[in-house]
UniProtKB/Swiss-Prot annotation:
Any single biological process term in GO: D-glucuronate catabolic process
GO MF, any single term: glucuronate isomerase activity
A Pfam family hit: UxaC
Family statement drawn from the similarity comment of this UniProt entry: Belongs to the metallo-dependent hydrolases superfamily. Uronate isomerase family.
PANTHER family the record matches: URONATE ISOMERASE (PTHR30068:SF4)
Database matches in HAMAP family: UxaC (MF_00675)
Species in which this protein is naturally found: Lactococcus lactis subsp. cremoris (strain MG1363)
Biological or metabolic pathway of the protein: Carbohydrate metabolism; pentose and glucuronate interconversion
Keywords annotated in UniProt: Isomerase
Catalytic activity: D-glucuronate = D-fructuronate; aldehydo-D-galacturonate = keto-D-tagaturonate
EC identifiers of the protein: 5.3.1.12
Protein's name according to its UniProt entry: Uronate isomerase
């Protein structure tokens, strides 16, 4: 089969039919990403391919380092064209890596350039792409609109004033840019900046934080504020997690120790985190939000690189907490007793957790359709094989037609072809089930499932259009 042909990843006739007749046409809701709302509002113009392709993309940075490229041409102050040449040189060696497919798919879909990036074509591609980047069609809003994206959910700190979201809500009519609340600084209470952060949270919420209860009250105010601007999700990263009973625990004392940068015992930290997550579950439930939990990830594990370059620069790895499902089971059992389990999507960076998490989810489903879900293959699992494995586990342990599907988790405005990539994998997976006689060869039945997973489910699950739908 030709590279990136119309039928790439579609290995049977059923898959081809499902993709071209059902998946391909569906709009996109990107419910988890790391795009900057300021860049969307200001409609930033990118000067060249390096700025839009390599800026902030730690997936690509890892490959560049593996190819011996100096940091000056990765995150440093090197010339943009030299950075692009280094990437082109590296990409030639990335055969079999999804970045090779993604990059060429982006080149083909956005720039309509159907050439392989290589030392022979790099200058031609650079010039041709940069000429197009100078046009308004390659500003962020046009890229979003022309990708048929209806909703973008950014990732935002609770103290954010969401000024760009406010402005976009007034001015942008073709798509929604909605905030998703991610309180990392309430989880990372041992980083030495906790007291300073609580002062920020207090100021923006208008609530004096003097203890754990008032901290949660301030957080609730931020949930209300985010909700007023269309917020429907919270997101939480737990590198590791150990459940701890919180009954009769002096949480105020733990909070005070953290504010004073005193060393917390492991038990104290686990008690605080458990209490915090339970309160966050309660708030998600109250506001009819969805809680996302990202677990089993080791972040910024290269100390010198962290100090020199900073976080989110490509020095993270898969976590190996073997009992994470056991600890989460205790958390959800406690939440069930308190009747505070919200809609939840669980992601683990370690594939070994997926089957355990899928069976855990089945024990705590509440009222409503698929309230708890196993999230899409995340980060290092955002590959054809990773996507297929997640689909297989979801289908075998729950109801695949209820799955809310793909998200980019990206910092790039050119990442939307990843939805196409996922839909191709989905159609091929389902097509194989048809071809092997495991599900009916019924286009109406199966085609609807493909359309639902691609768009309809996420539209209904999160309620982004609840007000508009109620008026119809």
């Amino acid at each position: 089969m030709k590279f990136l042909s119309e039928d790439f990843l579609l290995n049977n006739e059923s898959a081809k039919l499902l993709f071209h007749e059902h998946a391909e046409k569906m709009p996109i809701i990107d419910y988890h990403c790391h795009l900057e709302p300021a860049e969307i509002y200001e409609n930033k113009k990118y000067e060249n391919l390096t700025q839009i392709w390599l800026g902030g993309d730690h997936y690509k940075w890892r490959l560049l380092r593996a190819n011996g490229i100096p940091e000056k041409l990765i995150t440093g102050d090197g010339d943009d064209y030299e950075k692009f040449l280094a990437f082109a040189k590296t990409l030639e060696k990335s055969l079999g890596n999804p970045i090779y497919e993604w990059t060429h798919l982006e080149l083909k879909r956005f720039f309509h350039i159907d050439k392989l990036i290589s030392s022979e074509t790099e200058k031609e591609i650079w010039d041709e792409a940069n000429q197009m980047l100078a046009t308004d069609d390659f500003r962020p809003r046009a890229l979003i609109k022309n990708s048929n994206v209806k909703v973008v959910c950014t990732t935002d700190d609770p103290v954010s004033k969401l000024s760009y979201h406010k402005s976009l809500a007034k001015e942008e009519k073709d798509f929604k840019v909605l905030p998703a609340l991610r309180p990392d600084h309430l989880i990372s209470i041992t980083d030495g900046h906790f007291a300073e952060y609580l002062m920020e949270l207090s100021a923006v919420s208008g609530i004096k934080i003097k203890d754990f209860k008032t901290m949660i009250k301030a957080l609730e105010q931020r949930f209300e504020f985010f909700t007023s601007l269309g917020g429907r999700l919270s997101d939480h990263s737990l590198s590791t997690y150990t459940f701890a009973e919180t009954k009769n625990v002096d949480l105020d004392s733990i909070l005070q120790k953290a504010k004073e940068n005193q060393t917390l015992t492991d038990l104290e930290y686990n008690q605080y985190i458990t209490a915090l997550i339970l309160e966050i579950m309660k708030l998600n439930k109250k506001f009819d939000w969805t809680m996302q939990l990202h677990v089993n990830v080791n972040r910024s594990i290269n100390g010198p690189a962290l100090r020199k370059i900073g976080e989110n620069t490509g020095f993270d790895s898969m976590g190996t907490q073997a009992n994470i499902s056991e600890e989460l089971t205790k958390l959800f059992s406690k939440a069930a007793e308190l009747e505070i389990i919200p809609k939840t999507i669980l992601y683990s960076l370690n594939q070994n957790d997926w089957l355990e998490l899928a069976t855990l989810i089945g024990c705590f489903q509440g009222e409503g359709v698929q309230q708890l879900q196993l999230g899409a293959g995340w980060w290092f699992n955002d590959t054809a094989k990773g996507m297929e494995k997640q689909l297989e586990i979801f289908a075998s342990q729950s109801l695949l037609p209820n799955f809310v599907g793909m998200l980019t988790d990206s910092r790039s405005f050119l990442s939307y072809p990843r939805h196409e990539y996922f839909r191709r994998v989905l159609c091929n997976f389902v097509g194989q089930l048809i071809e092997s006689g495991r599900i009916p060869d019924d286009e109406a039945l199966v085609g609807k499932m493909i359309e639902d997973i691609s768009y309809n489910n996420v539209h209904d699950y999160f309620g982004f259009f609840k007000n508009e739908d109620s008026k119809q």
